[in-house]
Every structure is written in C-alpha cells, then in structure tokens.
Amino acid sequence: MMKEAVTVSNVTKHFQRKTAVNNISFSIEKGEIAAILGPNGAGKTTVVSMILGLLKPSEGEIKLFNRVPDDQQVREKIGVMLQEVSVMPGLKVDEILELFRSYYPNPLSMKELVSLTALTKEDLKTRAEKLSGGQKRRLSFALALAGNPELLILDEPTVGMDTSSRHRFWQTIHGLSDQGKTIIFSTHYLQEADDAAQRILFFTEGQLVADGSPMQIRSRIQKQSVSFTLHSSESLERLSCHPEVERVIHEHERTIIQTSNTDKVLALIFQENIHARDIRIEQATLDEAFRQLADGNREAM
C-alpha cells in the first residue's frame, strides 16, 4: 500500500537565468503534518506551486498519490487555503459553500464544515463582500475542506486570527491528521511550526537545507544558553574572557550567556565566584536554528 501523499524527486526550477529551486528531493507520508519554512526568496512558494501543478519543474518530477499534480483525480483530493482570500460578491456564505461542494464527488456535509470551521449561523447568511477578516479566514478554511480532501495545503493559515482562534484551528488540523489527511503549511510564526508540525522542511537559496522534526532540527545546532539574574553592580569581565563564553546578552533583568558548552560555563560561574541566582539552561530556539542554517548555507555557496 502506498504510504506517500507527496513525492518530490530531483526537482529543479529555473526562471530565465535564476534558479529558484535547485535539485530537491523529499516525500511526505499520508497523515503527516509538514511545515515548509524559509526566508523570503528561499523557494517555498515555487515548491508549493509545483506541488499544486501551477508550475512545472524544469527538471525532475512531482507525484501526488502516485499521479501527476494536474491529474483530475488528484485535484479532487486536494484542498487549498491561500493567504489572500478572494470572495464571490453577491453570494451568501452558505451559497458559496454549496457551490463548491457541488464540484466534488464526495464533499463534506454542511454540518461537518460548520463544525470544523466554527462558522456561525450569522456567518452563513452574510454576503461575501460584507465579511470581516476573521469571517473570510473561516470561509477560506471551509472552502479548502469542502471536497473532503486527502491533502490540505495551507498558506499562512492563521494570519489575522486571535490566540483562541489559532488554538482551535490547530486542534482541528490535528484532528484531520488523525483521520489520515495530509497537511502541508507555511507560516512565519515559528512557534506555531514548532508546536503544530510533526516535520519541518527548511529552504534557503532554493535548497532544502534541513528536514526533520522540530527537535531534530534544533539539535543540529550546538548553541545553548545559560541565563541568570545578577547583582547590578557585579562585573562579568572575568567571565567574558573565557573562550567558552561566545556572547553575553543583557535582556530585561537577566544575563544570557550563549555557549556550546553549558557545563563549562556553569563551572566557570562558580569558579569565578559570580553571584548568580535563578540559573537556567536553555536549548536553542527554532529561530536560532534557522538563522544558523541559512547563514551556513550562504557560506557554503
């Protein structure tokens, strides 16, 4: 039985003299929640456009459920939620949803769509052009789910949502994943990717430079930090001269020492008789991991 929902094999995409995507390969299994991340211009949008069949690779091939992306059977299995929401003026939300449901052989029921997306009775009877930003996001999510897709592709899905709406949204996404649906999303909220994604694919300069769970990616970088509070008059000069201390940051009322050897820094704090209180050892953040990966990739080019 085929386990992969998406297979990308040796794919390159050229635009005139620019290479937007350079020889990437990966596969995403059914039921997986994967985040595609990277700085602006990294190739993320091009990759997603090729997965959707909107662009064709210059080299290599992409298969969705072992078929080409523009196959009609494949299109019926995909739901897409874009960052920019286009509405159909003159129609009410329930009319738009019924129209979209009619395009698919096995659509979700209206009751299921309302339950999954938190659309209210008032939302359903509102004309599209009168929707608020939050209502438009809920409609966009409902349209992506209308055909009961096996693969959901979400572009910055929680932009404009408040904290409770985001929490509910990701609860729904995990429930869909538990049903075997595959979810691919992009986001600039790295904490969201850390919390929601089972797997992260990080792109920079058109290359796939990291692929793994959030924990696996964080573990690829060595930087950690030791933080503590300190008496305001105490100097850290004698601590700063040691090579294990890479950087000293004063943030709010805490002192943060970046290092690749936390054990040595802890020993130095006591050895130098630093009167530190509330000492904490912290792992690298996903943001720090991505900055190091992006910088390392530029240096290698």
Curated annotation (Swiss-Prot):
UniProt-annotated binding residues for ATP: G38, P39, N40, G41, A42, G43, K44, T45
Lineage: superkingdom: Bacteria
Protein name per Swiss-Prot or TrEMBL: Uncharacterized ABC transporter ATP-binding protein YvfR
EC assignment: 7.-.-.-
Organism of provenance: Bacillus subtilis (strain 168)
Family as reported in the entry's similarity comment: Belongs to the ABC transporter superfamily.
UniProt keyword terms in alphabetical order: ATP-binding, Nucleotide-binding, Translocase, Transport
GO terms for MF: ATP binding; ATP hydrolysis activity
All residue ranges annotated as the ABC transporter domain in the record: 6-230
Pfam assignment, any one: ABC_tran
